[in-house]
Amino acid sequence: GDILASLADGKVAAYATDFPTDAQLGVPGVIAIPHLGASTPESEDNCAVMAADELIGYIERGEVKNSVNLPELTPPAEFEKRVCVIYKDGEGVRENIVAALGGNITSLNSAAKNGLGYLVCDTPNPDSERITAVSGVVRMRII
């Protein structure tokens, strides 16, 4: 209808749609793209499952995926005791956290995004008071 007339008389240069009608298919200026189905019941179910899996990964392993405010981080799946620290990303903060962890670190992963750092460390005897006393530490938990 109206969009085809507007394309024909030059009022509209191009029209992109993910729901082209049969009449729009093959018309110059109509850009037909695949419909991603982001609002279908199936996609909403898939998104809910994905979000639940990501939350489980964070709670059980300290893993962060698809976060708005924290960096992506996938620590090793196997561990005995794990320390997860969210901190303000500033000069020396990460190093001070590592120093507070002491020795006997079996795995250490960290990343930063938008002014926040996230550190995951596997160590057998973390001192939570010493770690939370580091300037810049926002939150710390032991898994």
What are the residue ranges of the model-derived segments?
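Rossmann-like dinucleotide-binding domain for NAD(H)/NADP(H)
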Residues: 1-77, 118-120, 125, 143
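A conserved regulatory-domain signal marking ACT and ACT-like small-molecule sensing domains
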Residues: 65, 69-143
